[in-house]
Amino acid sequence: HGFLAFNEIHPDYYQIPVADREAIMAEAPSAEDEDHDDHVRDSDDGESEGGLADEERLKRRLMRRYKIQDVIKRRQILLVQVVKDERGAKGAALTTWLSLAGRYCVLMPNTGKGGGISRKITNTSDRRRLKAAASALKVPKGMGLIIRTAGAKRTKAEIKRDYEYLLRLWETIRE
C-alpha cells in the first residue's frame, strides 16, 4: 500500500470540469523532485520567486474547491512512481509526477516546465555547452529534461543517446 498526496496528482488525472482542469494546468508550477540532487531548475530561466508564489497560490485556490474524492475516483487507474519507500507501518509515498533517470539525463514526461542543467555543475563553459546540447534535443512539449552531474564531461552524442533511450523507455511504459 502507499500514500498519494493531493498535490502529487497530475492534473491530467483530475475528474473535474474541463475548464477548471485547464486553468490548473495552465498555472501549474513545475514539479521538482527533491529526492534527486542532480536535477533542478536552471537559475537563469527568468522566473522570479514572487512569480512562483503567485502561481502556487492560484493553484491552491483552484484545488481548494475540490476534495481528493472529487478529483480522483475509486478504481481509477493512475500511473504512479514510488518516491519514498515503505517504512514500518507507513506506506510508500507515491507521485504521478514521473521522472525517469538515465545515466546522464532525467526525463520528466509529464512536467511541461522545468529542466535544465544540474546545479552541481558550476563550470560556466560546461553549463553553456550542456545548455546548447539540451536545446538541440528538441524535447516535446509537456516534457522536461535535466542533464545530470554525470553528464558534465560527456559529448553531445552521449547525452543524445541517453535522452533517446529515456524517450523509448517512456513510450514502452505508456504502451
Region spans (language model):
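Single-stranded RNA-binding surfaces
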Residues: 1-175
